[in-house]
């Protein structure tokens, strides 16, 4: 597809594989399950104050769709998906899209740079060594209690508190993260797959958003 769009694409991380180049080099790739995104709403400056395309993907049982969402999907005459995502586009490009239409993986080209956004794997409650790569205390030489302790958390009576943002133990992972400037290695519209060089955030089966690179 020669026309460039600023909108993204919602896919599902399938896992990692590798492809071989013509000169025999092995390239690690992440496979993105790229089923067509169904357009549920077109937002315009006149009505909504900005231009955007709202999409859904996948399927959700009717029992799990609440009434407002069911009415929204019914109005657009699209099957209820597992969520709603929105992508800003230029006002002049809105005419290329219609409610009920589909966006396919061919909006991307081989060699194009993209940003991939996903939710990282959750690691649960972790200490500072795993969470922030702190250095461990001595294993011996008189140390018997503080092998993995973080050390001092502050000063003394002044300021008499722990500053916000102090690196401490806590929940690790399960946050939204973007990996930038990854290369599209292959686009297979018939099989619904996008192969992207390198790793992308999240576990296999998680939703990811693929967008044209913002810093390319």
Swiss-Prot record:
N5-methylglutamine modifications at: 157
Post-translation changes: Methylated by PrmB.
UniProt KW Ribosomal protein keyword: yes
InterPro entries xref list: Ribosomal_uL3, Ribosomal_uL3_bac/org-type, Ribosomal_uL3_CS, Transl_B-barrel_sf
PANTHER family, per the entry: 50S RIBOSOMAL PROTEIN L3, LARGE RIBOSOMAL SUBUNIT PROTEIN UL3C
Family: Belongs to the universal ribosomal protein uL3 family.
Function: One of the primary rRNA binding proteins, it binds directly near the 3'-end of the 23S rRNA, where it nucleates assembly of the 50S subunit.
Identification of the protein by name: Large ribosomal subunit protein uL3
UniProt source species: Xanthomonas euvesicatoria pv. vesicatoria (strain 85-10)
Lineage per the UniProt record: Bacteria, Pseudomonadati, Pseudomonadota, Gammaproteobacteria, Lysobacterales
